[in-house]
């Protein structure tokens, strides 16, 4: 079933606009064909009621049961020098159920804060596309970039992926926790000084073995472990 995204409801109708109208027509939805629409944390089965050039009115047939992520994960991701890699990370984090995404600026990361802020709108669009693909009912919140030195451990379990220095294995993390803060480095990882600063603040170093992973692979690995165990 094709899934679309709506920000507007009129009674029993959900309204598709702009880019969603274009996507709808590309899918060539047939008359009386049912499709899904995500709206305000819920997914509905709908049919077309009315259609014109600017909008499509979708009549709600039924509300589907939806699942929320079992863990509340905040991902602190060092902004990769290749910003296209960040697009991939945002998409994967959304599909995996991360609730909050915070870009961080570290020694080896991309440094231009204004450029990062400009990318935020694109990342929000990627979140919507990933929601439709994965049938996730709620968006991942994307926050403004912060400096690594400003991070504070605020979750039940606070983790830094640290494949270059000391670290525990994922099995030694508290997998019963409900809230996690996960800090992931850029290409080349964190410096020894940065790792030490975060450990002194209370972040637990975690080592993913046996090999050194790309930053986008590390995100998928650690989030999958936390969500499913």
From Swiss-Prot:
Molecular function via GO: rRNA (uridine-N3-)-methyltransferase activity
Catalytic EC class: transferase
Entry's EC annotation: 2.1.1.193
UniProtKB keywords: Cytoplasm, Methyltransferase, rRNA processing, S-adenosyl-L-methionine, Transferase
SUPFAM superfamilies according to UniProt: alpha/beta knot (SSF75217)
InterPro entries: Alpha/beta_knot_MTases (IPR029028), RsmE (IPR006700), RsmE_MTase_dom (IPR046886), RsmE_PUA-like (IPR046887), tRNA_m1G_MTases_N (IPR029026)
GO biological process: rRNA base methylation
Catalytic activity, as annotated: uridine(1498) in 16S rRNA + S-adenosyl-L-methionine = N(3)-methyluridine(1498) in 16S rRNA + S-adenosyl-L-homocysteine + H(+)
GO CC terms, sorted: cytoplasm
Organism domain of life: Bacteria
Record's subcellular location: Cytoplasm
Name of a matching Pfam family: Methyltrans_RNA
Stated role: Specifically methylates the N3 position of the uracil ring of uridine 1498 (m3U1498) in 16S rRNA. Acts on the fully assembled 30S ribosomal subunit.
Family (UniProt): Belongs to the RNA methyltransferase RsmE family.
Name listed for the protein in its UniProt record: Ribosomal RNA small subunit methyltransferase E
Source organism per UniProt: Aquifex aeolicus (strain VF5)
């Amino acid at each position: 079933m094709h899934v679309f995204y709506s920000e507007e409801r009129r009674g029993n109708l959900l309204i598709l606009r702009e880019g969603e109208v274009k996507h709808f027509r590309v899918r060539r939805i047939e008359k009386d064909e049912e499709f899904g629409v995500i709206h305000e944390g819920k997914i509905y089965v709908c049919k077309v009621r009315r259609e014109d050039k600017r909008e499509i009115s979708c009549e709600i047939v039924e509300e589907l049961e939806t699942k929320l992520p079992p863990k509340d994960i905040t991902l602190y991701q060092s902004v990769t020098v290749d910003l296209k890699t960040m697009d991939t990370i945002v998409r994967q984090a959304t599909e995996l159920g991360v609730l909050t995404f915070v870009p961080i600026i570290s020694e080896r990361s991309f440094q231009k804060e204004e450029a990062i802020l400009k990318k935020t709108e694109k990342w929000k669009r990627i979140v919507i596309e990933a929601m439709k693909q994965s049938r996730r009912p709620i968006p991942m919140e994307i926050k403004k970039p912060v400096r690594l030195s400003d991070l504070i451990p605020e979750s039940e379990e606070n983790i830094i992926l640290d494949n270059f220095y000391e670290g525990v294995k994922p099995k030694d993390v508290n997998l019963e926790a409900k809230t996690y803060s996960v800090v992931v480095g850029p290409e080349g990882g964190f410096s020894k000084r940065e790792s030490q600063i975060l450990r002194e603040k209370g972040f637990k170093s975690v080592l993913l073995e046996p090999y050194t992973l790309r930053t986008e692979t590390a995100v998928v690995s650690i989030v999958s472990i936390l969500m499913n165990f």
